[in-house]
């Protein structure tokens, strides 16, 4: 019996919608990252993007435990000397709530071209409205 290797053109991708309201950030991000990679499928192949599309709504209502709401810091660097910028979780969730979930999921995906392709299948929205009703997403309860 030969080992099965999925081919990118034969992978069937479904659309799922996740409501992040009241859910813990890390627990929801691990499940999303796993679904984006396709690890829930029998035909999972590590070097092929076999994952599904994930829509996350209500990103502004995600929950964090402990003192992370005030103490967690996100860093970015412009590439120039002295170009490091820092922003706390509570300020970032008010300014760009989508970035909180995107940063958590992106850190759990592979680094490189395959990880970037997986990350592009993640759609995050701050509120309850999204622009993907035509894809008829299935509700994913996490």
UniProtKB/Swiss-Prot annotation:
It comes from the Bacteria. GO terms for cellular component: cytosolic large ribosomal subunit. Keywords: Ribonucleoprotein, Ribosomal protein. Pfam families: Ribosomal_L13. GO terms for biological process: negative regulation of translation; translation. GO terms for molecular function: mRNA binding; structural constituent of ribosome. CDD domains: Ribosomal_L13. Part of the 50S ribosomal subunit. Belongs to the universal ribosomal protein uL13 family. This protein is one of the early assembly proteins of the 50S ribosomal subunit, although it is not seen to bind rRNA by itself. It is important during the early stages of 50S assembly. This is Large ribosomal subunit protein uL13. The lineage of its organism: Bacteria, Pseudomonadati, Pseudomonadota, Gammaproteobacteria, Aeromonadales.
């Amino acid at each position: 019996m030969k080992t099965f290797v999925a081919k990118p053109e034969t992978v069937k991708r479904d659309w799922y919608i996740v409501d992040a309201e009241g859910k813990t950030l890390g627990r929801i991000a691990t499940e999303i990252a796993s679904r984006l990679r396709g690890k829930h499928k029998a035909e999972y192949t590590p070097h092929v993007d076999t994952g599904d599309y994930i829509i996350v709504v209500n990103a502004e209502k995600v929950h964090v435990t402990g003192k992370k709401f005030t103490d967690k810091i996100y860093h970015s660097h412009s590439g120039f000397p002295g170009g490091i910028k820092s922003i706390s979780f509570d300020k970032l969730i008010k300014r760009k709530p989508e970035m909180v979930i995107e940063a958590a999921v992106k850190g759990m995906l592979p680094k490189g071209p395959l990880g970037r392709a997986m990350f592009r299948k993640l759609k995050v929205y701050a509120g309850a409205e999204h622009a993907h009703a035509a894809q008829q997403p299935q509700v994913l309860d996490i």
